[in-house]
Amino acid sequence: MDRQSAVAQLRAAAEQFARVHLDACDRWSVGLSGGPDSLALTAVAARLWPTTALIVDHGLQPGSATVAETARIQAISLGCVDARVLCVQVGAAGGREAAARSARYSALEEHRDGPVLLAHTLDDQAETVLLGLGRGSGARSIAGMRPYDPPWCRPLLGVRRSVTHAACRELGLTAWQDPHNTDRRFTRTRLRTEVLPLLEDVLGGGVAEALARTATALREDTDLIDTIAAQALPGAAVAGSRGQELSTSALTALPDAVRRRVIRGWLLAGGATGLTDRQIRGVDRLVTAWRGQGGVAVGSTLRGQRLVAGRRDGVLVLRREPV
């Protein structure tokens, strides 16, 4: 039997994803950068359902407007029913990469027409897992990207990057090559070009696939803990003068992993953002190793203030403090 073409592999992945996750949907959007991954996905998506291509111009590189307009024209030629260039302003909070990602997702959310297809591949998933491991980011980060996290859809998480590049060649598409992808100043670039090839060589191949399988297995475990934590939260919640508080005695009775997940959910509901494993464990110690210590500052979108989790009279409280 002839080997399935790259385009056919991508089409099969997109069709399978749609059957599992998007049964009631009849149109979708795709995030298009002009690079080979998103260009190949756009080509396949436009053949399946009415597709709107959304091209985000971050304005961070010389010629970005030309790159975006070229991608828009390609999307229309591939059969997209609409293609729009979305110009965004990238702030400085959390570093340029994080700020660009935040601006990009906000623009896609605002302008999307149905669910949004993102062209993350198995290789991207492997890099995400390695980043999480290296930074000690906790199980949720190591579990990688979710295939379906409405409205975000990642139908290519089981497909190697080499397949999207091959699909572009089969279709005669000229993809934009992002210079950041070869810039060694970026951690992901070095993971992609140095670390993963070395691991493949030392361990005899199959490392990217193994990392992706690890992410899937761990995500299943974290989903279960999330469910248990959601069921446990009402039993630990206490109505306070400044919103929901948590009873430390009720938290103490929970298994460690469940307790920390309850704390995480409580922090997020209270306005925390960008939580790290270190912060969550710091708040957890207010329950399990209470010695009268001060509170734990966590990230938030507050201006001129910071969000601090502390303990008072046997309950965890969230308070705002001036910076």
From Swiss-Prot:
GO CC terms of this entry: cytoplasm
Upper taxonomic lineage: Bacteria, Bacillati, Actinomycetota, Actinomycetes, Mycobacteriales
UniProt binding sites for ATP: 33-38
Keyword annotations from UniProtKB, A to Z: ATP-binding, Cytoplasm, Ligase, Nucleotide-binding, tRNA processing
Role summary: Ligates lysine onto the cytidine present at position 34 of the AUA codon-specific tRNA(Ile) that contains the anticodon CAU, in an ATP-dependent manner. Cytidine is converted to lysidine, thus changing the amino acid specificity of the tRNA from methionine to isoleucine.
Keyword Ligase: yes
Record localization: Cytoplasm
Protein's name in the database: tRNA(Ile)-lysidine synthase
Record-stated family: Belongs to the tRNA(Ile)-lysidine synthase family.
Catalytic activity: cytidine(34) in tRNA(Ile2) + L-lysine + ATP = lysidine(34) in tRNA(Ile2) + AMP + diphosphate + H(+)
Entry remark concerning the domains of this protein: The N-terminal region contains the highly conserved SGGXDS motif, predicted to be a P-loop motif involved in ATP binding.
SUPFAM superfamilies noted in UniProt: Adenine nucleotide alpha hydrolases-like, MesJ substrate recognition domain-like
Listed transmembrane segments: none
Its EC number(s): 6.3.4.19
A GO BP annotation: tRNA modification
GO molecular function, one term: tRNA(Ile)-lysidine synthase activity
Pfam families in the record: ATP_bind_3, TilS
Predominant place of localization: cytoplasm
